[in-house]
């Protein structure tokens, strides 16, 4: 069985930034990106009875040059984890970009910033969908420290497409 190289993106355990939303990101790089092979790999994943749902978005004909897979896995305690698996064309615009962002965040993140990010994540209503990079940019770049400040920051910095920020 051929297995494409995968890079765990968030590395949330290393930076200790996981709070409430059980979400793990992986980037899988191949050249060429074979849509059928991607579906075959996900079919194997779907055979695991702990995988409860899988979604797919084809972005091959965009600047992102990828396929987004989102799977929900139920752990032994009954908690659902979201696994975001982004299958990316090697050599495309975003090849390695998000891994570099994660490395830069790790390099500049202080304990005080980490705690501020965790506090904001904790205070975020469960119904609110916010990308991790929004928290990181608000805290690291703009010094946001309270949830009301964060709400205002988000109003002034709406997300449109891919967030291309790097500390």
What residue spans do the PLM features occupy?
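Short, charged/polar surface micro-motifs in flexible loops or helix N-caps
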Residues: 32-36, 78-79, 90-93
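Conserved catalytic core of two-metal-ion nucleotidyltransferases
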Residues: 49-89
